[in-house]
Amino acid sequence: MMTNLFSVFDPSTTIFNMSLNWFSTFIGLLIIPSTFWLMPNRFQIIWNNILLTLHKEFKTLLGPNGHNGSTLMFVSLFSLIMFNNFLGLFPYIFTSTSHLTLTLTLAFPLWLSFMLYGWICHTQHMFAHLVPQGTPPMLMPFMVCIKTISNVIRPGTLAVRLTANMIAGHLLMTLLGNTGPMSTSYIILSMILITQIALLVLESAVAIIQSYVFAVLSTLYSSEVN
């Protein structure tokens, strides 16, 4: 019986009082075989096609005013988040994307850099974004307040969306995993096993979707300041 359901997210692996769980964020660089870097294979060809597709889509979202090479940042962001989401599905591996410490670290600097660049280099454009076209004069102050609040909470919504989706799926899998050992019926155990497999497939889809949503929204926020 678990004393705390959220204990699965605790960064508790330590050596000499130093937390090692956050190293799981970069564990992919250690476990990827060197052959992936030296010669093309099926995995690398598929992955390159995925990255090329994302590059084209992000380039379209950024528009003609987007800076050259800016899509590399968003494609890398997608790869980092998706890889860590998938790592969290493996047993005994720390899920770094289920913590606001990581998600806010990714979202807030991006949003802040976009805002600083926009307000310094494109001040009139940023002021124009505060009032949608066709807004009646009486509603302009109200719309400015709404747009300002929506801009300020953007990094928080980005971070919380990713964290909440990762936590929700892991909690369901943890609950089912703790229910199985207490059951003596083979029928119930079979149903729990099938449900666990279905949840694992669902979580795999969520891992891809949430990393894609995070990268796409970051790209859209960047396109607004150009």
UniProtKB/Swiss-Prot annotation:
Protein name per the record: ATP synthase subunit a
Gene transcribed to yield this protein: mt:ATPase6
Pfam families to which the protein is assigned, alphabetical: ATP-synt_A
Cross-referenced InterPro entries: ATP_synth_F0_asu, ATP_synth_F0_asu_AS, ATP_synth_F0_asu_bact/mt, F0_ATP_A_sf
Membrane topology: Multi-pass membrane protein
Keyword 4Fe-4S on entry: no
An MF annotation (GO) of this entry: proton-transporting ATP synthase activity, rotational mechanism
One cellular component term from this protein's GO annotations in UniProt: mitochondrial inner membrane
